[in-house]
Amino acid sequence: MDSVAFEDVAVNFTQEEWALLSPSQKNLYRDVTLETFRNLASVGIQWKDQDIENLYQNLGIKLRSLVERLCGRKEGNEHRETFSQIPDCHLNKKSQTGVKPCKCSVCGKVFLRHSFLDRHMRAHAGHKRSECGGEWRETPRKQKQHGKASISPSSGARRTVTPTRKRPYECKVCGKAFNSPNLFQIHQRTHTGKRSYKCREIVRAFTVSSFFRKHGKMHTGEKRYECKYCGKPIDYPSLFQIHVRTHTGEKPYKCKQCGKAFISAGYLRTHEIRSHALEKSHQCQECGKKLSCSSSLHRHERTHSGGKLYECQKCAKVFRCPTSLQAHERAHTGERPYECNKCGKTFNYPSCFRRHKKTHSGEKPYECTRCGKAFGWCSSLRRHEMTHTGEKPFDCKQCGKVFTFSNYLRLHERTHLAGRSQCFGRRQGDHLSPGV
C-alpha cells in the first residue's frame, strides 16, 4: 500500500503564516483541523489521553508534536510523516486507489473529500469559490452551486460551462437592456416621468418605492444623523460621511489615470467608466461634443433645443425635470410644509428651511481666508471667493460673454433661444465685452 503524506489531508501553516491569519481564518483552521482528526480516528487511529481543545492553543506546534508522538519522525523528512507509520491505520477506498479528486487551484493541495477543499478554499484570503478551477467530485446539486465545472455522470469527463446572462428587456428610447421586468419598468419611468408612489403629506411623488420610504422618514422624524455645518438630517451613516465631505472639501478617492479626486468611491467608479473605460461614440450634432451613452446625449441635446418635458396642469408652464414641476405646483396649492419652531415661519422647500434656521443660530462656519468674511453656506463662500479671484469660467458659445456662475449663463442663453438680436445686458451696436 502506497504511503499518503499527512499534509494530503491536513492544512498546515508555519508560525509565520499563522501570524498573518485573521481571527476568522484561525477559527476556520480550527474547525478544519478538528474534522481532520475525527476522520483520522474514524479510519483506525486511537486517541488516548488527548485533549483536542488544548491542541488549538498553539496549532502550529501542537499539531506536529501530536503526529510525531503517534508516528515518530522519519530521518531527513521532518514534516512528511506518513499514514503507513501510524499503527492500525486503514485508509478508505479512495486513498487505496490513489484517487484524489479535490485539488486546490491556488496552492496545489489535494484532499480526499470535497468538504475539505471547500473549507480550505475559504482560508485563501480574497479567493472566491466561483473562480476555483479545482477538480471537484460532487453531487449534481453542488455542481450547480459551484457553477464553474461539472462532471458528466456517464463518462466522468469534466466540461466547462460558461454562464451567460440574457437581458431580454430593452428600452426603445435609450437602448439600455435589463434582465428583470421590474427593473425595466422602473427605468421606463425615467423617460415617461410617471411617479407611482405619492406622499400623503405633501405634493410629491417618486418612481421607486425605496425612495418613497426614505422620504416618508422626513415626516416621521426618523433622522439619526444631522450635519453640524448645515443642519441637514440624513438617514444613513455612509451618506452622512459623503455629505460632510461636501463641506470639508475632503476627496479621498483619486483617479489613477487623470488624478481627479472624488468624495466617494461611487463617484470615482462612475468617473472611471464614463471618462476612461467607455468609448464616447455618441456625438452631438449641434456642437460636436461626444458622450459615452445615449441618455447623456439626450440630456445634453436639451441644452440646445431648450426642450422642457413636464407641464403644469394649471398654468401650462413647462419644466425640464419633474422635481422642478413638483416644487412649482406648491405655488398653486399654497402648501408650505416646513415650519420653523422658533418664529413660526413656513417654507416650501427643505433647503430654504435649513438656510432660515441659521438666521436664529447665527452659525457661520465658512470664513474667507482673504478678507475674514464668514458665511453660513459653503456655496456662499465659493461665490464670494470668486469676487477676489475674478474668475468667470462660464462663457456663452454664441457671443463669447463670460459669467461667474452657471445660472447667470443659463439666463443669458435664453435671450439667444428666444431669437433676440442682442445679448443680455448689451444694447445693439455695442462692442462685445467679456464680462458680466
Swiss-Prot record:
UniProt subcellular location: Nucleus
User: Gene3D superfamilies recorded for this chain?
Assistant: 6.10.140.140, Classic Zinc Finger (3.30.160.60)
KRAB domain span: 4-82
- What spans are recorded as compositionally biased (Basic and acidic residues)? 128-141
* Transmembrane portions of the chain: none
Highest rank taxon of the organism: Eukaryota
Zinc fingers, C2H2-type, are found at 102-124, 169-191, 197-219, 225-247, 253-276, 282-304, 310-332, 338-360, 366-388, 394-416
What Pfam families does this protein's entry cite? KRAB (PF01352), zf-C2H2 (PF00096)
Q: In which tissues is it expressed?
A: Expressed in a variety of adult and fetal tissues.
Where in the sequence is the signal peptide annotated? none
Q: Which GO terms describe its biological process?
A: regulation of transcription by RNA polymerase II
The Polar residues compositionally biased stretches are 151-163
MF terms from GO for this chain are: DNA-binding transcription factor activity, RNA polymerase II-specific; RNA polymerase II transcription regulatory region sequence-specific DNA binding; zinc ion binding
**GO terms for cellular component:** nucleus
Provide the alphabetized UniProt keywords. Answer: DNA-binding, Metal-binding, Nucleus, Repeat, Transcription, Transcription regulation, Zinc, Zinc-finger
Is tRNA processing set as a keyword in this record?
A: no
Task: Cite the residue spans of the region called Disordered.
Answer: 128-164
| Homology family | Belongs to the krueppel C2H2-type zinc-finger protein family.
Q: What does this protein do?
A: May be involved in transcriptional regulation.
Provide the protein name.
Answer: Zinc finger protein 101
The UniProt gene name for this protein comes to ZNF101
